[in-house]
């Protein structure tokens, strides 16, 4: 019984240390708000309007990528959200921006066979996407630490729903397609809310 109390106390102390550490990191790491990111995300197309405000024509203004208007989370198929979380970061809804279990597994793989798996969570990937097109990417240790700090700060200031919504709108998916709306229309011919289980898995 004494061992149980000792383990419980140790766990409580560890959780307190983690909570304080992440709070300090978040306080020292500035990030934009969700609305700032959403409003500053520009699509690759521009709409030509008539004098009365009616749309006349859509023009492609960026030929390097195809990114359409921002899509709210409620307008994205839950099947797709589940598929992305399962494939990219299955503990997304529970971690604080960094997944210690995946990180430890990646380190073990690296030392075991030299082919380490990526340990970046969805929040860490979003941190890279927000900071000038994934400039953190697969870079130096210092840049990875910066990505780690940024992800923790995002988790403190944004909701999980905001994080997954921003990720799905900013992530490059296939070829020139950026964001879920461009990918859904380009690959399947319909909006993100109509994706079924099979399409979501793709």
Question: What positions do the PLM features span?
Answer:
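Juxtamembrane regions of bacterial inner-membrane/periplasmic proteins
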Residues: 1-202
């Amino acid at each position: 019984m004494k061992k149980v109390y000792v383990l419980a106390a140790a766990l409580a102390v560890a959780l307190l240390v983690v909570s304080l550490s992440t709070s300090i990191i978040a306080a020292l790491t500035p990030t934009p708000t969700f609305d700032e990111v959403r409003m500053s995300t520009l699509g690759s197309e521009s709409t030509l309007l008539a004098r009365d405000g009616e749309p006349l024509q859509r023009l492609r203004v960026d030929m390097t990528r195809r990114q359409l208007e921002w899509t709210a989370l409620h307008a994205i198929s839950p099947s797709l959200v589940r598929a992305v979380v399962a494939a990219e970061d299955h503990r997304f809804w529970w971690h604080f921006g960094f997944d210690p279990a995946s990180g430890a597994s990646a380190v073990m793989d690296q030392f075991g066979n030299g082919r380490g798996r990526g340990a970046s969570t969805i929040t860490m990937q979003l941190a890279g996407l927000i900071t000038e097109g994934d400039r953190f990417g697969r870079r130096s240790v210092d840049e990875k630490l910066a990505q780690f700090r940024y992800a923790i700060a995002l988790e403190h200031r944004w909701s999980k729903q905001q994080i997954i919504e921003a990720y799905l709108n900013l992530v490059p998916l296939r070829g020139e397609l950026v964001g879920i709306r461009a990918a859904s229309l380009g690959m399947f011919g319909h909006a993100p809310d109509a994706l079924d289980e099979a399409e979501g898995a793709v």
